[in-house]
């Protein structure tokens, strides 16, 4: 039987790392988590991702895979039997990849402007942020999950950002919940045990955001 | 037998569109190409890609797929038999996706600063541009193609940008060839008939760049 040595180089506040903690938990894969200090990255991190020098990195039997959506596809391909994330139909797969990329291209950068911005730029970012989630609600439609009746690739790509909602809302004084009712229903559905356990408490993220704002001279 | 109605909404100067013209040609898929006017986008384009409103878009039996790497994977999955682009091994697949994403995240934006920039920013962009291709040469190593003995996903993702080399070099007065010898050898290998036919003449791209610079008030 093939041995599976799985190591995840990660940082607990990273939404990108959370995706992989969720996927590994859903699929019941045992792994060793190594928390990185992003201000003083380990030699292992720099060796395993010399191009981007970023977490998360999955090391499977000594070989590194980088970039969270790429790792998510890898995990889904290698351990496909339990809780498949991407559908088997090529068109449905293309749609899932499209929306996961949409999340990657929009939420992190706009979210950063929401928690770190000031004045007009922050107000603009809040509007854009709500628009992004309205667009995602449009894609969700009347389904329970983005994946349909079962959670899938897009759900796992998106749900980590909900652990940041409290920080976005507190830093920028607005309510995502009040604007995006459908998203809240979806979020409640996502709170099955294995997903919740892989997400940090929103207050822990907020502490991290305050620390970061302090470091950046924004607080 | 399943009917295949394939339409490509495209713009001839787009490196992202070229990827798909190459893939469709390599796989021998007949399709209708519809050239878009990017200053006056068609109602079909806006209907088929309401989120990003961008070419290229592949419409397969009436259903749209957007984002060039996503479309490339879709084409490879639906028409897998002839000239497979992604390898079958999950680790090799993850590496191909990693490098294709690297190309997407780096070349277009840095290339734009090379052809449109001025002074110090342009000099900086030229340096970064060469560094990007040096990194890609490192990945190519001693292989004929990024895909190994046969051209693959990364080769198709990258080769369209070579049709822009003349424009980059002429606008910014430098030589990519002089700095990146390995890349030139690779580029020559790529010039098999079906790839060449899918790429516009470098002078046509240069005319387009001059027109664009004029429109943007840079010429």
From Swiss-Prot, chains A, B:
One GO term describing the cellular component: cytoplasm
PROSITE patterns registered for this protein in UniProt: GST_CTER, GST_NTER
Positions of the GST C-terminal domain: 89-208
Domain of life: Eukaryota
The protein's enzyme class: transferase
SUPFAM superfamilies (UniProt xref): GST C-terminal domain-like, Thioredoxin-like
Substrates-to-products reaction catalysed: RX + glutathione = an S-substituted glutathione + a halide anion + H(+)
CDD domains attached to this UniProt entry: GST_C_Tau (cd03185), GST_N_Tau (cd03058)
A molecular-function term among this protein's GO annotations: glutathione transferase activity
UniProt-annotated binding residues for glutathione: 14, 41, 55, 67-68
GO BP terms, alphabetized: auxin-activated signaling pathway; glutathione metabolic process
Keywords: Auxin signaling pathway, Transferase
Induction of expression: By auxin and cytokinin.
Residue ranges of domain GST N-terminal in the record: 4-83
UniProt EC number: 2.5.1.18
UniProt key word Transferase: yes
PANTHER family: GLUTATHIONE S-TRANSFERASE PARA-RELATED, GLUTATHIONE S-TRANSFERASE, GST, SUPERFAMILY, GST DOMAIN CONTAINING
Summary of the function given for this chain in its UniProt record: May play an important role in hormonal and growth regulatory responses.
Sequence similarity: Belongs to the GST superfamily. HSP26 family.
Name listed for the protein in its UniProt record: Probable glutathione S-transferase MSR-1
Organism expressing this protein natively: Nicotiana plumbaginifolia
Lineage of source species: Eukaryota, Viridiplantae, Streptophyta, Embryophyta, Tracheophyta
